[in-house]
Structures are given as structure tokens and as C-alpha cells.
Amino acid sequence: MKKQFNRMKQLANQTVGRAEKTEVLSEDLLQIERRLDTVRSMCHHSHKRLIACFQGQHGTDAERRHKKLPLTALAQNMQEASAQLEESLLGKMLETCGDAENQLAFELSQHEVFVEKEIMDPLYGIAEVEIPNIQKQRKQLARLVLDWDSVRARWNQAHKSSGTNFQGLPSKIDTLKEEMDEAGNKVEQCKDQLAADMYNFMAKEGEYGKFFVTLLEAQADYHRKALAVLEKALPEMRAHQDKWAEKPAFGTPLEEHLKRSGREIALPIEACVMLLLETGMKEEGLFRIGAGASKLKKLKAALDCSTSHLDEFYSDPHAVAGALKSYLRELPEPLMTFSLYEEWTQVASVQDQDKKLQYLWTTCQKLPPQNFVNFRYLIKFLAKLAQTSDVNKMTPSNIAIVLGPNLLWAKQEGTLAEIAAATSVHVVAVIEPIIQHADWFFPGEVEFNVSEAFVPLATPNSNHSSHTGNDSDSGTLERKRPASMAVMEGDLVKKESFGVKLMDFQAHRRGGTLNRKHISPAFQPPLPPTDGNALAPAGPELPSQSSRADSNSVGGPVPSSSGILEQGLSPGDSSPPKPKDSVSAAAPVAGRNSNQITTVPNQAQTGGNSHQLSVGTAHSAAGPSPHTLRRAVKKPAPAPPKPGNPPPGHPGGQSSPGTGTSPKPSTRSPSPPQQQQQQQQQQQQQQQQQQQQQQQQQQQQQTPGMRRCSSSLPPIQAPNHPPPQPPTQPRLGEQGPEPGPTPPQTPTPPSTPPPAKQNSSQSETTQLHGTLPRPRPVPKPRNRPSVPPPPNPPGTHMGDGGLTPSVPTASRIVTDTNSRVSESLRNIFPEIHSDLASKEVPGHILLDIDNDTESTAL
């Protein structure tokens, strides 16, 4: 207590009073003392922040720390999810990523244990052990110095007072002297110890700095190990992703999509084509009518994920067509490529048709292999679609307009509208001829179900079922329609578009047997084996003048002796299986065409094995129909002139269209005056009466056998039939002078057509279109009997009721474009063929039902 009191007294004197304060430390030691506090603060905060950086639990071993890491929990979650997803791409990705995260967690736990042992513990020792010990010695030195100063002050005071009281002070002074010396010794000892510790601390400062070097080295080592784990996992995950074929097809380059999927035809193209072949070939406005946005988006997503469940889209062909257009448009490079854009546009400006087709063929061969195969596949489908343009209204021109901008566009920058406006004209001029002559550009048939992944529908929707025989390879189950439905369809086509292709429709009527509900074998004479392809259909096919537009549905036109021609039913339109039902079969046709048709039932019965069905015209009790009155006001043209020497066995009154004067093409003329209309109406009625009398005579003179026309008559060609510019490849079973060559590496120009040897007869017969203009005089009624031809010469009837096609009939010439009759016609009328062959026939001549007459239309 006494020492403590003396210390406090001395401290007060030094602080408040003027007592001398002894400083035992040197300046260097004082600087070291001031630095100790800073170093301790630094070590303390570093230790605290490092603990915060740890993800594991501090102070535990490596195994327990690894289990508590967040990365370990993430890895376990990924591995559990991968087990649930099994062999999917996402499952494989999660499995690989989970393993990598687990390895990263292990490396992190090892890193934290090392940092805690090698860095954090030494820093904690500096801040909490070494520096506090030095500071404790400094305080001890301060107390010893106070004691020493106190003893020395008392000794000095006792020494001063010894002069006055000398007897009692010697012993006290000696005691104080001993205390002072002892206190001084303690101060020196403590001072030396403190100085030694301070110098040692300063000497270890470089060693303390190595802790932070070790920290960075530990972190670098951890990151290297973590990087090794990641570099091992990344290639494996990329391999899983590259091997997975189910990637979006829309917006992906064609080559990449085909390589990844291992396909020859792009999946969206094949899927959409197969769906449209099932239900869309008869859909009006296909590729023009837009689909619902939600349905289109759903179909695109289904194609992107390569799903096979596309059954629900059979009922919406417009959505399928929209998806096909969208895929072609979203390709990074168009199907016809940017590199050939300049060549395509240059070819589009070529005026000469033959050169244009040759240039197009050459440019097609320059397409890359993948683009060429897919372009060929698509063009073949579009050509098949155009075959039913009478129903779906999608002609090659319409298809080129709506689909062409999706096949080729410029690489230049700009809005979609600007690019389409700049390209559409050239694209249409390129795509349209390629679709028209698809068989010449790409010979051979195309199997649309390339991948064999699409199964035909068992019961297709009747609203979208395909009715033509040409669509039989699409896999649909055709529903046979009655003849009346087919006739109504032809009538509808007549009302909507007067440009009727007679020859095309006749060939279609003969070939497409699926259009008919019933076909009676009684009306199909057996074909002789020698010339089965050229046999004409049984029954006369003579359309009347008042039903020119209906010639597509009832047969090819043959000139009669008067202004009004007989109208017969082709075998395809005879729905009843028995001849006695011919009246009921002809009734719908008569109602549709507004003609008065009288059927002779016993005529077909007396025909023997030929089963000929003859239909004549007669007056109805109700008078002429409104259609007849409306068409009677036309300005009729005279009938074609008579041939100089009619063939034997045929009536001399029958006219031949193969005479020197060819009929002119159909042109529109103004309506005649009212007075002239009345006169012509009377003439029309008189002609009908005369025709009725002639029909009665015909019934009396009718003999069994097939009705034939003169062999000198040239083929009657429809004026609107386009000239065959590039040829189609010869079909199976088609006879010709020699097989048509395929296009060579550099094809010869298709000069109507290039490999046209197999189509020589067809090209000659199609040149018989009227091109010489002539005035239209008012025809005078001529009384010409329409007596059927006499019986065939002996030897023409075969034992089985068949007919030997020794003389080609008019119906055979009209319907069979591959007949060889044209050779004999050129021998009979060489000047006509030489004259007409040198004239250019327009590609499309439309029939004007209201203004054109029989001769002008022919």
C-alpha cells in the first residue's frame, strides 16, 4: 500500500506539479512502441475478415467442413435431379455438372483448412499474444520508473534536511539510498527486456509479411485445382450437347441442321409437305390465307423439338403452309443462296423462253448439294400442288408470288418490306417457270416420305381429302365422288375462271378414275393389246354451242353439221352401271347446262358389246332456258368450211377444222343490237327443230358399233392450251420415236421442248390453234343432217366385242395427246401443218363463254 501511495503521489507531482519525469526509452524504442498498436489492429481485422470469407464452419476438420459447404448441397441437388431425368440431355448435363461442383467443394474445403492453419492462426497469435506481451512489459517499466522517481525524490528531500538535524537522519538517508539503487536496477532490467522484445518484433516483421504471400499462393493453388476440374467437365458437357440432335430447326443454317439430324431433307420441309399431301392439296388459297398466330406458333415449336405428334395439325393446312413459309424465311441464308442471287436476277430478265430455261437449269446445278436436294424436293411438291389449281386456285404463278420471296432475297440491309419489294418481281420470274417445268428441271419421281417417319392417315378429313388420281402416292384413302359432284365442280370452275384448259381436263378425266363414284364395265370396251393407249373412249363427245364452257366436264368438242352440236357423256360421267339408266344419268347434266337433251334408251341396248350411249338434243315443253336465251344474243361466226373431198363412209355435211382457213382465237366483241338478237334467237329455235328431226333419222339408221369421225380430221386442240415449252419426262409405258434424253451437264436449249422427240406429235397437234383474224359474218342456218356414220368395215369387230383401232376417232385424237395420228395428218394436209407450225401460238387463250362462238373458240 505504501508503494502504491508513493506511486500515485509521484504521478500527481509529475502531472500537475513540476516534478521531473524520467524517460528511460530511446527514440527508436518509442517508434517501435507506436507501431505495435497499428500492427495489432491490422492483424485483428485481417483475422476477422478472413473468417467471414470462409464458406465452411470455422474450426472444424476438412470432412465436416466439406459437408457443410453450399457447393456440396448444390452438387447433391443436381445429382438427384439427374437421376430423375434419366437419359435425357438435361439429365446428362446435371450429372456432369453435379460431379464438377462436388469436386470444387472438396477443393474449397481443403483450401480453407490450409488458410486457417497457415495464415489465420499466426495472425491471431501476433494480435493476441506477442504484441500484448510487449505492451505489458511497457506498462511494467512505467511502474518501475515511478517507484524509482519516488524513492529518489524522497532521498533528495532527506539529504537536504540532514544539515539541520544531522543526528537523526544518517540511518534514514542510507535506507532511502538503498531503495533508490534497488529501484534503479529494476528499471534497467525491465528496460532491457522491453527493448529486446521490441527489437525481436521488428526483426520478425518480414516473417509476418510472408503470411499474406502464403494466402495468395493458397488461393492460386485452389483456383488451379478448381480450373482443372472445370476444364475436365466442360468438354464432356459440350460433347453431350453436340451429340443431342433435338435442337431448334427454325433459324438454324440448313447445312448444320442436316448434319446434326443426319437427314437429307430438312425436318420442317418434309413434315409440312407430308401434312399438306394428306389434307391440303385441295385447300383453296393454300400459302395465301394466313393461319392463326397461336396455331402457327404451336406448330413451329412442335417442329423445333422434333416431336412426332402432329396429328392435330391435319385439320389446319393453312397453319402447316404458314410454318413452311416461316421456316424458309427464317433460314440465315435463303434456300437459293446469296451467292447465286445475281445469277437468278439476271436470268429473270431474259426474254427468250428457251434461253431462260437453259440458264435456269444451269444455275440450279450450281446450288450446293444440300440446297439442291431440298430445292428439288420442294419444287416437286409445288408442281404437284399446281396440278390441282382448278380447285385450290394455286397456279404456278400464284405459288411463285406467295412463296418465291421466301426462297430468295437480297443480302443487303433494309426492312423486310423493302427487300421483298426489290426481289419479288425477279423471284416470280424465276420460280414460276421452274414449277411449270419441274419434270424437265428435275427428272424422275420424288419419294416425299424420305425419312419414312410419316404414316398416312387411316381416315382423313373429308373436307380436305385429295380426290385426284395423281395424288394416290400421298397415302390418303380416296373417297370416290359421284359424277354429279365432279360435274358441279367443273361448272364452278367455269363460273370462277373462263380460262379452261380443255385438253388438260380431258386427259385428267380419262386418267383420274378416283374422281368417279362408280365406273361401269359395260361402258368400257376392252383395250386391244396392240394399241391400248390410243383407244378412244366409247360414246360420242359432241358439246353443244350453248354449253361451250361445259365441255370440260362432258368431253372434247367435235364440229357438227349445224350451229348447235350434239352433247354426249363421256364414259367417266356415266355413273349408272346399266344402259337403261342413262336417262337418270344424263338428267343432272341437262339441268346444269340448261340444254334440252333427249336420251335414247334402246339405242344403247342395240349396241351389242359396244354399249354405246348416244344422247341427242330435243325441245323441251318449257321452251329454251335462260342460259340459251342469254347465249343466243351472241354474234355467231360461220361454221368451219367443208373439206374438199370428204372421206367415204361419212356424211358430207360434216365440217373439218383442218382446212386451209384456221379459226381465230377468242376475242371479245360488243353485243349485237336488239333486233339482231331476236333474229338470231329465231334462227336458234329453227336449228333446234331441225336437229330434232335429224335425231329421229339417226335413231332409225343407227347401227351397233363405235361412232368414229373421219380419219382426215386433224386433232382438235383447245385454244387456251399452252404450248409445251420445256418437255416433261416420258411416263412409264409411253411410246415414242426414241426415249427422251435427260438434261446433260450443259443442257441444250429447250426449244419447245428441248428433249422433244417423245412429244413431237403432241407439239404438232397443239399448233392447230387459230391465229389468223377474220371478220365475223352473221351465219346463215344450214340444214345439215347429223346422221351417225355407217357401220365399220368388216373385220373391225373382234370376237370379244372390242374394236381394233384401225382409224383414230375424234375423241381419240382429242383425249390422247400421244397418238400417232399426227403423222398421217401431216401426209394428208402438208400445207396446213407447214403453215401452222411456223406460227407462234399464244401460251394461254381464255374462253369467253358469253361472247365467243364455236368456231371462234376453236
UniProtKB/Swiss-Prot annotation:
Keyword Kinase carried by entry: no
Major location (coarse): membrane
Membrane topology qualifier: Peripheral membrane protein
Gene Ontology CC annotations of this record: bicellular tight junction; cytoplasm; cytosol; plasma membrane
Compartments, record wording: Membrane; Cytoplasm; Cell junction, Tight junction
SMART domains in alphabetical order: BAR, RhoGAP
GO BP terms, alphabetized: actin filament organization; calcium-ion regulated exocytosis; negative regulation of small GTPase mediated signal transduction; regulation of actin cytoskeleton organization; regulation of Rac protein signal transduction; signal transduction
Region (Disordered): 459-482, 516-823
Swiss-Prot/TrEMBL site (Arginine finger) positions: 288
Annotated ranges, domain Rho-GAP: 252-442
Ranges for domain BAR: 14-246
Residues bearing the modification Phosphoserine: 484, 575, 710, 712, 751
Biased composition (Pro residues): 637-650, 716-729, 738-756, 784-794
Pfam family, one: BAR
PANTHER family for the chain: 3BP-1 RELATED RHOGAP, RHO GTPASE-ACTIVATING PROTEIN 17
Subunit structure: Component of a complex whose core is composed of ARHGAP17, AMOT, PALS1, PATJ and PARD3/PAR3. Interacts with NHERF1, FNBP1, TRIP10, CAPZA (CAPZA1, CAPZA2 or CAPZA3), CAPZB, CD2AP and SH3KBP1/CIN85.
Protein name: Rho GTPase-activating protein 17
Organism: Rattus norvegicus
